[in-house]
């Protein structure tokens, strides 16, 4: 179990402000825009940065001031940080070699983790010849082979295309035996992977809970970040807005995604976002119906 208590840190232009949460054997996704403080949080947990105040407790042990190598934390940075002069096998085995594990045990563990992540065919490859997705899997294998108490992932799919991203997410879903803290700005990843979800804004954790917070935000800040329409004290997801015949609204902008369109409708003084397959043009008059609304506090 990971417990973060009142963690604060100022680093360069980024800051954390009294962040507190806990996760057990759950996949936790931390969402937020660039500069929100997500990476500062994960670096503090990994031991790369020392917090200005607060506590980090891992499985009952206070690790706040421990050096990174004594935390039993698996950390995969955004740039993967692989050794370019070593092949895949040696990159994965590196931590075990440093710990002076015997060669037979190293070989067994490397092959086991490589099979788990579907990279057995890459073991003899030079890492410089790997794609971004392959490098990500190697970095993940190098972290998991040390049997960490928690896995920390900093934007693990940010540098790969959509097809590779889907493949990596499929591999991440396999990790069930330890807590995972996954930093991203991708809402789809949070919906797919998150058993717990946190939302960062300006260094503060403004929401934390199960993934239902993505469908029913409790306050305006969270609703705005998630792209909800806000009418008075209610949040309405764009997918819960039905466009129909009528004269209540005027189409003011359209983004065409092929099969469907994202439509912006001026309605009672608000700009309402909706998705539709209807053939519409800017200036068309339409009616709106709202299926589900969440009251904001």
UniProtKB/Swiss-Prot annotation:
Its EC number is 7.3.2.6. PROSITE patterns: ABC_TRANSPORTER_1, ABC_TRANSPORTER_2. SUPFAM superfamilies: P-loop containing nucleoside triphosphate hydrolases. It is a peripheral membrane protein. Belongs to the ABC transporter superfamily. Sulfate/tungstate importer (TC 3.A.1.6) family. Its main location: membrane. Residues 2-226 form the ABC transporter domain. Gene3D superfamilies: P-loop containing nucleotide triphosphate hydrolases (3.40.50.300). The keyword Transport applies. It comes from Methanocaldococcus jannaschii (strain ATCC 43067 / DSM 2661 / JAL-1 / JCM 10045 / NBRC 100440). ATP binds at residues 32-39. It catalyses: tungstate(in) + ATP + H2O = tungstate(out) + ADP + phosphate + H(+). One of its GO terms (cellular component) is plasma membrane. InterPro entries: AAA+_ATPase, ABC_SmlMolc_Importer, ABC_transporter-like_ATP-bd, ABC_transporter-like_CS, P-loop_NTPase. It is found in: Cell membrane. This is Molybdate/tungstate import ATP-binding protein WtpC. Keywords: ATP-binding, Cell membrane, Membrane, Molybdenum, Nucleotide-binding, Translocase, Transport. One of its GO terms (molecular function) is ABC-type tungstate transporter activity. Part of the ABC transporter complex WtpABC involved in molybdate/tungstate import. Responsible for energy coupling to the transport system. Coiled coil: none annotated. The complex is composed of two ATP-binding proteins (WtpC), two transmembrane proteins (WtpB) and a solute-binding protein (WtpA).
């Amino acid at each position: 179990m990971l417990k973060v208590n009142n963690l604060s840190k100022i680093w360069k232009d980024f800051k954390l402000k009294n962040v507190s949460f806990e996760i057990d054997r759950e996949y936790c996704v931390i969402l937020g825009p660039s500069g929100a403080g997500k990476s500062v949080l994960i670096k503090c947990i990994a031991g790369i940065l020392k917090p200005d105040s607060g506590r980090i407790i891992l499985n009952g042990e206070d690790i706040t001031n421990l050096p990174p190598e004594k935390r039993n934390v698996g950390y995969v940075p955004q740039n993967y940080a692989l050794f370019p002069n070593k092949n895949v096998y040696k990159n994965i085995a590196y931590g075990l070699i440093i710990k002076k594990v015997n060669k037979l045990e190293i070989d067994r563990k490397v092959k086991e983790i490589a099979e788990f992540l579907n990279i057995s065919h890459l073991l003899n490859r030079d890492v410089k010849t790997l794609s971004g997705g392959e490098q990500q899997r190697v970095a993940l294998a190098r972290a998991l082979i040390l049997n960490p108490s928690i896995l920390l992932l900093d934007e693990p799919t940010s540098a790969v295309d959509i097809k590779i991203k889907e493949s990596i997410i499929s591999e991440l879903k396999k990790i069930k035996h330890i807590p995972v803290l996954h930093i991203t700005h991708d809402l789809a990843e949070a919906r797919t992977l998150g058993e717990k979800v946190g939302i960062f804004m300006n260094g503060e954790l403004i929401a934390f809970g199960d993934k239902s917070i993505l469908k029913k935000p409790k306050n305006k800040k969270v609703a705005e970040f998630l792209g909800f329409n806000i009418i008075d004290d209610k949040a309405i997801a764009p997918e819960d807005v039905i466009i129909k015949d009528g004269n209540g609204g005027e189409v003011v902008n359209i983004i065409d995604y092929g099969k469907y369109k994202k439509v912006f409708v001026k309605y009672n003084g608000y700009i309402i976002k909706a998705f539709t397959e209807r053939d519409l043009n800017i200036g068309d008059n339409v009616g709106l119906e709202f299926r589900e609304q969440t009251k904001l506090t």
